[in-house]
């Protein structure tokens, strides 16, 4: 995931100031651009030097061959004149008066210089890449420039009534329908572990089937992806911070051989976007094949580092969940990827409209975008029980930022072109099931239970096609009852203690005559 290096090179038509401005707008380190330009300049010098040295090496070999053919004396002295030690400026005329022994000495010096230059070049290449991978994609002009997501995300539009208030939040409702077991889940899997139960298992499967059916009707190719990826491939689709904050590492044996002691490092996927991005790795895509649409279904795994204390109850923010993802490879020309961007968020909106879930579309501020996204729109559903908007969908156009490192190229092979072009890659959530379940529970709650949204009824079993009935009391009501009971008991105890104290005072104040 990187920008085109030519964007940093003024002699190639690039303008580093444009990228500096992008870094400023992203509220990221601007000095990375200057460090990269310096490293790239030194790298290009090394490559130029290496080219000259290789020419010198070939010249030495040719001169030795000619002298041997002419049977000239080999010579014993390998002392070199000063002009023969200027390796990058060697010419046939410089080598002509030298003996074979002297030219062989020149070739040894050239080999040593090549080795040092290659070492310097590789070091600079690694340094340049470290800077490059931390510089974000160019921003779309419509992105709001701010580092305050809460205050400055721009609401583009809303759908449905986003003012409705209802009694219970999803935290209570998952318990009331007996569709969730959190305590046992935490014992088995640790924090945020859970078992989905009974009616919510069916509701989740209904959402999956309905979402896939819609995407299939829109010419998406369905993919059930691997759940883990090799480290070297994951490095091409995930930014560095994700390895520390989001991804789970899996360690296994290097092969299936019993005597193999090597270690194989893999990473659990955080979204099916990651394996689908690599699905066409190293391929050339013809213009007439685009756009290529994929609908990814997978379990997703996220560490949620930095989310301590947020959404600790219920199933809204968990370490493991099912998700259907839209992923598209698009042409880099004529704004085609931006047309696809609008289509993808429109597909997601249509899905939630048919479910009857109110929402708003939010344009995310520059400072909150990941490196790859040129622009991101979120669909935030209205949760009437929680009295809040919560994110259900993220739709991003990453332009050619991801494709470059994955080497997914556009058009003809490089032999037919001056320079390889890369496809544009876009992703958008269709349905993260646990979050959508939470939204359905809050929006469709009644006194008796949860009304099943019309499009999902066909996927639900007999007895659950119309309503998922409440079978347990709301935890919040039980907590309130306990508090009230405790307060009442405390009041009685205080009153009783107060009566005893009055009696003791009277006894102490009694005189002999009183008795």
Curated annotation (Swiss-Prot):
Just give the chief location class. cytoplasm
Catalytic activity of the protein: tRNA(Ser) + L-serine + ATP = L-seryl-tRNA(Ser) + AMP + diphosphate + H(+); tRNA(Sec) + L-serine + ATP = L-seryl-tRNA(Sec) + AMP + diphosphate + H(+)
The cross-references to Gene3D superfamilies, in alphabetical order and at most eight, read: Bira Bifunctional Protein, Domain 2, Serine-tRNA synthetase, tRNA binding domain
Phenotype for residue 429 to A: Abolishes tRNA ligase activity. No effect on ability to regulate sprouting angiogenesis
Q: List the disulfide bonds.
A: none
Compartments, record wording: Cytoplasm; Nucleus
What PROSITE patterns has UniProt attached to this entry?
AA_TRNA_LIGASE_II (PS50862)
Disordered: region residues: 475-515
- Residues that hold L-serine according to the record: 271, 302, 325, 427
Biased composition annotated in UniProt, kind: Basic and acidic residues: 479-507
ATP-binding is among the record's keywords: yes
What InterPro entries does the record point to? aa-tRNA-synt_IIb, aa-tRNA-synth_II, aa-tRNA-synth_II/BPL/LPL, Ser-tRNA-ligase_type_1, Ser-tRNA-synth_1_N, SerRS_1_N_sf, SerRS_core, tRNA-bd_arm
Q: Where is this motif: Nuclear localization signal?
A: 482-494
Keywords, alphabetical:
Aminoacyl-tRNA synthetase, ATP-binding, Cytoplasm, DNA-binding, Ligase, Nucleotide-binding, Nucleus, Protein biosynthesis
The UniProt entry, under PANTHER family, shows: SERYL-TRNA SYNTHETASE
Q: What does this protein do?
A: Catalyzes the attachment of serine to tRNA(Ser) in a two-step reaction: serine is first activated by ATP to form Ser-AMP and then transferred to the acceptor end of tRNA(Ser). Is probably also able to aminoacylate tRNA(Sec) with serine, to form the misacylated tRNA L-seryl-tRNA(Sec), which will be further converted into selenocysteinyl-tRNA(Sec). In the nucleus, binds to the vegfa core promoter and prevents myc binding and transcriptional activation by myc. Thereby inhibits the production of vegfa and sprouting angiogenesis mediated by vegfa.
Q: What is known of its domains?
A: Consists of two distinct domains, a catalytic core and a N-terminal extension that is involved in tRNA binding.
Protein name as catalogued:
Serine--tRNA ligase, cytoplasmic
What is the protein's species of origin? Danio rerio (Zebrafish)
Phylogenetic lineage: Eukaryota, Metazoa, Chordata, Craniata, Vertebrata
